[in-house]
């Protein structure tokens, strides 16, 4: 589906993902990434078979993706309703991998990439600038509507896409990251976001007891990367 940044780039007309999404799912003002997740069904995925293959090739540990920048947890997440058990394949994919890896006698790690989700989804709040859908907002606008009567009820869409940062400061272009320090000026949102960031990591650790974890940034300051505002520090390392 056009790479691991497909979810962000399906809302950007200058990327191939936009055209690919248009042909397969429809215009992102009506069918966005949420609709990709709804129909996602990796029915050919067999963690046990892949684990045996990796072991025979010489691997003795595997890191498995827990969540990417798309903010969609690949386990039965306690703190993120947009997960692979509730929506999409209805499978605890991380749990399947953990079981297969342990049965093979290998070490097991989980990677977490949801540090960037707070800015990564800003493209979903944009719109086409030209063409028949010019000015029609993409489906990020739906985070401000009730989930009642929608196919994703009872899961708030805001928990997937987040909020439009235009609530805080008008930004006309999202090249990569918003300007430095935005969280420092909006402490309530920073506190909520960093708490959820840590709770989701702790939830996966408690459920699957990995030998290693990896997270973007580091375990002390989840928003320490280049040009990100540190906001409220959240330490998952204590667990």
Predicted regions and their residues:
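Mature catalytic domains of secreted/periplasmic carbohydrate-active enzymes
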Residues: 1-239
């Amino acid at each position: 589906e056009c790479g691991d940044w497909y979810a962000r780039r399906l809302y950007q007309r200058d990327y191939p993902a936009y055209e690919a999404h248009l042909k397969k799912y429809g215009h992102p003002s009506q069918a966005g990434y949420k609709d990709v997740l709804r129909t996602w069904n990796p029915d050919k995925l067999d963690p046990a078979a892949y684990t045996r293959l990796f072991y025979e090739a010489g691997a003795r540990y595997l890191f498995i993706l827990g969540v990417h920048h798309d903010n969609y947890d690949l386990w039965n997440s306690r703190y993120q309703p947009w997960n692979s058990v509730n929506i999409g394949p209805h499978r605890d994919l991380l749990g399947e991998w953990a079981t297969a890896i342990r049965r093979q006698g290998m070490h097991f790690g989980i990677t977490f990439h949801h540090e960037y989700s707070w800015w990564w989804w800003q493209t979903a709040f944009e719109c086409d600038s030209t063409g028949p859908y010019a000015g029609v907002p993409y489906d990020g606008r739906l985070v401000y509507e009730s989930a009642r009567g929608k196919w994703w009820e009872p899961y708030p869409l805001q928990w997937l896409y987040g909020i439009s940062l235009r609530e805080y400061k008008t930004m006309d272009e999202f090249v990569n990251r918003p300007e430095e320090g935005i969280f420092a000026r909006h402490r309530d949102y920073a506190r909520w976001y960093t708490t959820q960031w840590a709770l989701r990591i702790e939830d996966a650790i408690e459920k699957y007891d990995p030998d290693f974890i990896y997270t973007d940034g580091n375990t002390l300051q989840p928003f320490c990367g280049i040009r990100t505002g540190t906001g409220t520090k959240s330490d998952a390392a204590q667990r």
